[in-house]
UniProtKB/Swiss-Prot annotation:
GO BP terms: gluconeogenesis; positive regulation of gluconeogenesis
Protein name according to UniProt: Serine/threonine-protein phosphatase 4 regulatory subunit 3A
Function: Regulatory subunit of serine/threonine-protein phosphatase 4. May regulate the activity of PPP4C at centrosomal microtubule organizing centers. The PPP4C-PPP4R2-PPP4R3A PP4 complex specifically dephosphorylates H2AX phosphorylated on 'Ser-140' (gamma-H2AX) generated during DNA replication and required for DNA DSB repair.
Modified residues (N6-acetyllysine): K642
Main location: cytoplasm
Record localization: Cytoplasm; Cytoplasm, Cytoskeleton, Microtubule organizing center, Centrosome; Nucleus
Entry keywords, A to Z: Acetylation, Cytoplasm, Cytoskeleton, Nucleus, Phosphoprotein
Biased segments, Polar residues type: 721-752, 772-781
Acidic residues: bias regions: 670-681, 793-807
Organism whose genome encodes this protein: Mus musculus
Family of the protein in this entry: Belongs to the SMEK family.
Length: 820
């Protein structure tokens, strides 16, 4: 079907009382067997699919609005609308609906909107039509009472609306308004306020078209200035005529479009500023007013898009060097308002809108505008850019990659955005925060497209790290040339925090691009300089950046961290924080706890070998002692690979397997008695029977002897130690300024009687520094007392020692056979 008269858009009203566009198609009417009646059918013009199939129900209230709209409710809270391209098509379908319902096509509504009680309906139907009082000054109070009394009843509202419409009553009321103002009749003006407000609540399109006409709308606004609850009238008309003057920056040749823009602005002003807040009214009382504004906006955007001369002139003047600054500012502000206007459109309409702007060259125009000195113009251009990025980031990426082939890095659009972020003069960096959000959207791989021939992620990130990343990190590198930030004022700290936030996002999402950049440019070392900042939020941003890197558990990063000794700034910050329980203390402990729990072997060894002296006295959490235990276990396995192999056998391979298999093997083990042993040998898997018994049993015997000795020492320590609760980290530690690994600590707290002193050789029997059992038992008893460290995971400690504990749970007969 190619008849444009029947071309329509289908809309549904969502939960937020906004209209959603369901598609464009052609409407027809006909009998549908499945629905058993005449129905409205809309088929999509793109593929012929069925957009709407709605039976014309004899009892459904259909409304005709603005000559080209038909609105109705299918069910509770499900409103539909057909917006016709031409009035003739709307009239044809309206006649068909009225024919089915047996109504006169001259009416604008076919049924009462809300059912009433039978008694009330009978009374109203038996009474004659509503008779309005004569429109005179002396009867304004009576008219106001009539309007107020009609609002609760839908049928009375309908009768009142018809009477007002048929008698041209609104224009008569507005004539009285002029008389009251001339006579300064305040009482009469107060009555007119109540009358006009009540007419809005009638929710009638035909009345709105009269009230919002060019000759009436300012008088309607005038009536609404005289709110009886206010001591002085508002000056809405003065604002609209003097302050909010319409500036036609580009001549609009279409008078209908110009009138529609004026009308929409004023009606929007009435809705937002003049009428009381919507919460005062019953739900849906102003739904027709919302619809009136919405469809006006759709129409305006469509008319502007179709006016190619208007848009061509707009962009030509924007980029013309001869355009004076005041004119350019007006043009940019108009374009900004135009884009803001489009946000009310549905996705399909917005798609066409931004595609039109793109074809007209909006991005090159923005690039020119952003390079100008006028801060107001640049600010408006930034807002326009944000609309484009939010709606279609791929379009922006494609543009910046294409221009990189022709222009230097300094004048690339994305680099201009970064420079404006860095150079934001606002003390609160409001503009910088907005721009950082836009950059984050542009570099987010989640909204990048992938096709068979090319991947936008690979291409754009390659471009970004080659042409733009050095601009983003410039303030960071400039401020971290020494051991502490060269500038540490609040605004600089805020800016660097924004840069770090974006870099942290890149670490999480960009894999090898950011990895190569960090390692090649030594970025992490520079970032950790900021841990010496006096601003805690900046130091925490730097720590968060490192924590994100460690969280990846990437050995390339780990080797870089160890090679450059990049735990030193963190340990320094931890020690300088002293005994304060704050976010810095918790965040640092959490980072080391992550290394322990995840058993990152390389970092565990690096931390203990280089920083144990500084951390060994931290006993209010078990994190660092747990790290030391991990380290000793690693070294023990390295020194005794055969012991490690045997232990894995005794642990039943330690790692979690199928639960049923595990239970069967445990049952076999514990059901085995001495008769199952041959010549005092342990039962091992057949693959291990070929091993030399002495090679296996000798280290086991030594291990059991050391274990017994440790347990006896630990019992003595526990008996002497006061387990009254968690100790406060009231230690005083100093840092020497020698080599990077020369971190020393000194405890100001007196050692507990019998507590371990400085650690000796971890591998020697009975070494005071090797007390894993004491550590875990102390932690367990403290937990029973109800006090737990800031970042303390006793369950993890139990898991670490679980396998050693299993040996103690073996039957006595089996222990004897191992020790014999």
């Amino acid at each position: 079907m190619t008849d444009t008269r029947r071309r329509v858009k289908v809309y549904t009203l969502n939960e937020d009382r906004q209209w959603d566009d369901r598609g464009t198609g052609h409407v027809s009417s006909g009998y549908v067997e499945r629905l058993k009646g005449m129905s409205l059918l809309v088929r999509a013009e793109s593929d012929g699919s069925l957009l709407l199939e709605s039976k014309i129900n004899p009892n459904t209230a259909y409304q005709k609005q603005q000559d080209t709209l038909i609105v109705w409710s299918e069910a509770e809270n499900y409103d539909l609308a057909l917006s016709f391209q031409e009035k003739a098509g709307c009239d044809e379908i309206w006649e068909k609906i009225c024919q089915v319902q047996g109504k006169d096509p001259s009416v604008d509504i076919t049924q009462d909107l809300v059912d009433e009680s039978e008694e009330e309906r009978f009374d109203d139907m038996s009474s004659p039509g509503l008779e309005l009082p004569s429109c005179e000054l002396s009867r304004l109070e009576e008219i106001a009472e009539l309007v107020a009394s009609s609002l609760p009843s839908p049928l009375r509202r309908e009768k009142l609306a018809l009477a007002l419409e048929n008698e041209g009553y609104i224009k008569k009321l507005l004539e009285l308004f002029h008389v009251c103002e001339d006579l300064e009749n305040i009482e009469g003006l107060h009555h007119l306020y109540e009358i006009i407000k009540g007419i809005f609540l009638l929710n009638r399109t035909a009345l709105f078209e009269v009230m919002f006409s060019e000759e009436c709308i300012m008088d309607v606004i005038g009536c609404l200035e005289y709110d009886p609850t206010l001591s002085q009238p508002r000056k809405h008309r003065e604002f609209l005529t003097k302050t909010a003057k319409f500036k036609e920056v580009i001549p609009i040749s279409d008078p209908e479009l110009k009138q529609k823009i004026h009308q929409t602005y004023r009606v929007q002003y009435i809705q937002d500023m003049v009428l009381p807040t919507p919460s005062v009214f019953e739900e849906n009382m102003l739904s027709t007013l919302h619809s009136f504004i919405f469809f006006n906006k759709v129409e305006i955007v469509g008319m502007l898009q179709e006016d190619e001369k208007f848009l061509t002139d707009l962009f030509a003047q924007l980029t013309d060097e001869a355009t004076d600054e005041e004119k350019r500012q007006e043009l940019v502000n108009f374009l900004k308002e135009f884009c803001a206007f489009s946000q009310t459109l549905q996705p399909q309409n917005r798609d066409a809108f931004f595609k039109t702007l793109s074809n007209m060259g909006i991005l090159p125009a923005l690039e020119v505008i952003l390079g100008m000195d006028d801060t107001q113009v640049r600010s408006a251009a930034t807002d326009i850019f944000s609309y484009l990025v939010e709606y279609n980031p791929s379009m922006v990426r494609e543009f910046v990659m294409q221009e990189a082939q022709q222009n230097d890095d300094d004048i690339l659009l994305i680099n201009l955005i970064i420079e404006h972020m860095i150079c934001d003069t606002d003390p609160e960096l409001g503009g910088a925060v907005q721009l950082m959000g836009l950059l984050r959207t542009l570099v987010d791989p989640e909204n990048m497209l992938a096709t068979a021939n090319k991947t936008e992620k690979t291409e754009f990130l390659g471009f970004f790290y080659k042409h733009c990343m050095h601009v983003l990190t410039a303030p960071l590198l400039a401020n971290t040339t020494e051991d502490k930030p060269s500038k540490d004022d609040f605004q600089t700290a805020q800016l660097l925090a924004l840069v770090l936030e974006l870099l942290t996002f890149c670490v999480e999402h960009h894999t090898y691009h950011i990895k190569n950049y960090i390692i090649n440019k030594d970025i992490l070392r520079r970032v950790l300089v900021l841990m010496a900042s006096k601003h805690a939020f900046l130091a925490l941003c730097a720590l968060r950046f490192k924590r994100k890197i460690i969280g990846l558990k990437d050995e390339f990063y780990n080797r870089y961290i160890m090679k450059s000794f990049l735990f030193e700034p963190v340990v320094k910050a931890f020690l300088n924080n002293g005994s304060r329980y704050n976010l810095m203390n918790s965040a640092i402990i959490e980072m080391f706890e992550f290394i322990r729990v995840e058993d990152i072997k390389s970092l565990t060894a690096h931390v203990i070998e280089n920083y144990w002296k500084a951390l060994e006295d931290v006993d209010y959490v078990q994190t660092f002692k747990g790290l030391k235990l991990r380290f000793e276990q690693q070294r023990e396995r390295q020194d005794n690979p055969k012991l490690d192999s045997m232990r894995s056998i005794l642990r039943n391979h330690r790692y979690r397997r199928d639960a049923r298999t595990l239970e069967d093997e445990e049952e076999m083990w514990f059901n085995t008695d001495e008769d199952d042993m041959e010549d005092g040998e342990a039962v091992v898997s057949p693959s291990d029977k070929t091993k030399n018994d002495d090679d296996i049993m000798d280290p086991i015997s030594k291990f059991m002897e050391r274990k017994k000795l440790k347990e006896s020492e630990e019992k003595e320590v526990l008996l002497k130690t006061n387990l009254s609760g968690r100790q406060s980290p009231s230690f005083k530690l100093s840092l020497s300024s020698g080599t990077k690994t020369n971190l020393t600590s000194q405890s100001s707290a007196t050692s507990l009687p019998g507590s371990p002193g400085s650690p000796g050789s971890p591998g020697s029997p009975g070494s005071p520094g090797s007390v894993p059992k004491s550590t875990s038992q102390t932690a367990a008893i403290t937990t029973k007392g109800g006090l737990v460290g800031l970042v303390d995971y006793p369950d993890d400690d139990e898991d670490d020692d679980e396998d050693e504990d299993k040996e103690d749970t073996l039957p006595v007969s089996k222990k004897a056979k191992f020790e014999s």
